[in-house]
């Protein structure tokens, strides 16, 4: 029952965010002049940096506060990853004899239990596979947020005038707390129970009477090598998006290396910028698509997470593209907003 409560709490949070934030973006994207006032209102809340409406400077904070998202993301994801990994090693070990990869992976990604949150019909081996899959997803998320944190300090040089609405700031904090939890929400209660028991044992027995946990590097990593094809395909797609986002962020950061350019905007070139105006947004969608595939694609919570990322960044990319077209007369005509040859 606790598992159901956690899962539906996370799903409820995503559904609420969809109604409050994504639905207005969809309505604002309808191409009709009757919605101009509504569109400006939405952009005043959702815009940031160069696409923030000039009249919306009230209730804004510097865009460099983006770093707060990644500090929260790194700390929270690290805690979830460490707890889940310890739980997996101690309570869900995998042996090569019992771990029949193709059968387990195909069943967990199959149709009969799609979107299910119940584990009563799972065998112990299938449940252990599910736990190690969560470890894999959190490990990918850790790689992502750690790079974003490093970039926020050493790559991006925000214009002093770049700001974002305070509601957008809170939305970012919400995202980097809820996104990692979404990747492991179906096992979070048992992991929390395991951690609670370990803490209680430590408090009750004291440090001198608590046995040091055994650590075997091979046994801690080898189960990840036994995951299914969906996990490795998803991981490869994730890394593809991750690498291109790193390159695109490096290009954007290089545009402001000269202090005299701190307040200037320059047309970026290189990597996926040859095709779209916001390739870093496209790469973000690609890497979250990788997480979705690696999850098996059967958890509606992760679908809600992916949909939020895709909808939010598609809208932001469209506004960014229109800004570029207004700002630069020589802007490349062959570039699309975010999806090559489509939009």
From Swiss-Prot:
One of its GO terms (cellular component) is endoplasmic reticulum membrane. Pathway: Protein modification; protein glycosylation. Keywords: Endoplasmic reticulum, Membrane, NADP, Oxidoreductase, Transmembrane, Transmembrane helix. Expressed in roots, leaves, stems and flowers. Its EC number is 1.3.1.94. It is a multi-pass membrane protein. GO terms for molecular function: polyprenal reductase activity. The keyword RNA-binding does not apply. It catalyses: a di-trans,poly-cis-dolichal + NADP(+) = a di-trans,poly-cis-polyprenal + NADPH + H(+). The keyword Transcription does not apply. It holds the Pfam family Steroid_dh. The chain crosses the membrane at residues 12-32, 66-86, 164-184, 223-243, 266-286, 291-311. Plays a key role in early steps of protein N-linked glycosylation by being involved in the conversion of polyprenol into dolichol. Acts as a polyprenal reductase that mediates the reduction of polyprenal into dolichal in a NADP-dependent mechanism. Dolichols are required for the synthesis of dolichol-linked monosaccharides and the oligosaccharide precursor used for N-glycosylation. Involved in the regulation of plant growth and reproductive processes. Belongs to the steroid 5-alpha reductase family. Polyprenal reductase subfamily. This is Polyprenal reductase 2.
């Amino acid at each position: 029952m606790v598992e159901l409560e956690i899962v539906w709490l996370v799903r409820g949070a995503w559904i609420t965010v969809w109604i409050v934030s994504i639905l207005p973006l969809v309505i604002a994207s309808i191409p009709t002049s009757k919605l101009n006032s509504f569109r400006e209102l939405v952009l005043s809340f959702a815009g940031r940096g160069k696409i923030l409406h000039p009249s919306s400077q009230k209730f804004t904070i510097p865009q460099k506060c983006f770093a707060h998202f990644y500090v929260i993301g790194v700390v929270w994801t690290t805690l979830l990853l460490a707890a889940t990994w310890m739980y997996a090693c101690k309570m869900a070990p995998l042996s090569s004899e019992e771990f029949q990869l193709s059968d387990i992976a195909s069943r967990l990604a199959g149709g009969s239990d799609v979107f299910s949150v119940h584990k009563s019909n799972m065998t112990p081996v299938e449940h252990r596979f599910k736990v190690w899959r969560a470890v894999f997803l959190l490990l990918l998320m850790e790689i992502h947020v750690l790079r974003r944190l490093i970039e926020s300090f050493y790559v991006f040089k925000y214009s002093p005038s770049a700001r974002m609405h305070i509601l957008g700031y809170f939305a970012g904090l919400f995202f980097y707390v809820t996104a990692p939890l979404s990747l492991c929400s179906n096992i979070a209660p048992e992991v929390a129970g395991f951690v609670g028991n370990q803490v209680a044992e430590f408090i009750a027995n004291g440090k001198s009477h608590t046995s040091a946990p055994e650590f075997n590097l091979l046994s801690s990593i080898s189960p990840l090598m036994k995951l299914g094809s969906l996990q490795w395909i998803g991981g490869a797609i994730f890394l593809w998006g991750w690498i291109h986002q790193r390159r695109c962020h490096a290009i954007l950061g290089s545009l402001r290396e000269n202090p005299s350019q701190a307040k200037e905007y320059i047309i970026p070139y290189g990597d996926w910028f040859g095709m779209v105006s916001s390739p870093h947004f496209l790469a973000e969608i690609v890497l979250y698509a990788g997480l979705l595939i690696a999850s098996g694609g059967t958890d509606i919570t992760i679908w809600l997470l992916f949909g939020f990322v895709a909808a939010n960044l598609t809208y932001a990319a469209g506004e960014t593209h229109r800004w570029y077209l207004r700002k630069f007369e020589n802007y490349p005509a062959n570039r699309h907003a975010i999806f090559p040859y489509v939009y």
